[in-house]
Amino acid sequence: MASLRKPSNHADRACSRRLRVATRVAGRRMCRPVAATKASTAVTTDMSKRTVPTKLEEGEMPLNTYSNKAPFKAKVRSVEKITGPKATGETCHIIIETEGKIPFWEGQSYGVIPPGTKINSKGKEVPTARLYSIASSRYGDDGDGQTASLCVRRAVYVDPETGKEDPAKKGLCSNFLCDATPGTEISMTGPTGKVLLLPADANAPLICVATGTGIAPFRSFWRRCFIENVPSYKFTGLFWLFMGVGNSDAKLYDEELQAIAKAYPGQFRLDYALSREQNNRKGGKMYIQDKVEEYADEIFDLLDNGAHMYFCGLKGMMPGIQDMLERVAKEKGLNYEEWVEGLKHKNQWHVEVY
């Protein structure tokens, strides 16, 4: 997932070859870009760890606190476009004011119910939530536990014959969120999700593989690991992020990532797969599986020694990754299916795609 919107039954999240995200479309308001002179609210470059309210470390993992029938009412604080002009789509960082009343853990998701989701046979609106992975730690971007952030790609449908956008087929929830203004009320469900949680062992290496907004849960990870001072959680392992996007303008949270890489050179690694700017070893486009393959031997060794591997993003990323890993496993004399099952059994293998 991501912020992703998740499950396949969510119409505006379902990705087809003809569902594209336009960066500029005449007559439609876009996410407001932040002026060059104004600091972005979507990134933190100050790497001096900040103190956070430890009460959020207490108790059991929150799960399904709010439902479609009884959602939580939150308000949008800000919406910021975080992709550049040459990106193939528009992605927004959205900060939501929750007042700490819908707590979550890193790796979980919120449901968002957009207005006018579905009308039943009696003419009444039926609330249907779209799921988005949360892109902040449980303490929010401010570190006080009063907000949560989403990373949302605006989904629009472009007719393959005319090349024009069809407003009737645009993603309902993603456009509602990207068009929101400060103070906009949103109905939320959740939190949900157990698949992408951080391991209890703070020494375990983390290998995170993302495409697009699949980076959202991993942002919650790296902020907990490197930006926040949590007395009960001192991350000492390796954090390795592989990120696949089209080009440099499509990189998400790169300033924050570069600041972490500079502050923790021996503990944080970052590798991009830029399909429209880089070539793989065979001269073709550099996709996420190609970049991961460059370090396959090291990754297999890390997994043999207790590393956790996470995948989040478009479901189309997984076949190429699985084919590559199966080929490498065979070269190493391993049965791929048994190898993966062994990792799943030890809870080292985490996949959430949409």
UniProtKB/Swiss-Prot annotation:
GO molecular function: ferredoxin-NADP+ reductase activity
Recorded catalytic activity of this chain's protein: 2 reduced [2Fe-2S]-[ferredoxin] + NADP(+) + H(+) = 2 oxidized [2Fe-2S]-[ferredoxin] + NADPH
N6,N6,N6-trimethyllysine carried by residues: K118, K124
Swiss-Prot/TrEMBL keywords: Chloroplast, Electron transport, FAD, Flavoprotein, Membrane, Methylation, NADP, Oxidoreductase, Photosynthesis, Plastid, Thylakoid, Transit peptide, Transport
Cofactor: FAD
Residue ranges constituting the FAD-binding FR-type domain according to the UniProt record: 69-198
Gene3D superfamilies: Nucleotide-binding domain of ferredoxin-NADP reductase (FNR) module, Translation factors
Pathway participation: Energy metabolism; photosynthesis
One cellular component (GO) term of this entry: chloroplast stroma
UniProt topology in membrane: Peripheral membrane protein
Binding locations of FAD: R130, L131, Y132, S133, C151, V152, R153, Y157, L172, C173, S174, T213
Primary localization class, coarse: plastid
Root EC class: oxidoreductase
Matching PANTHER family: PTHR43314
Free-text function comment from the UniProt entry: May play a key role in regulating the relative amounts of cyclic and non-cyclic electron flow to meet the demands of the plant for ATP and reducing power.
Family: Belongs to the ferredoxin--NADP reductase type 1 family.
Protein name: Ferredoxin--NADP reductase, chloroplastic
The gene coding this protein: PETH
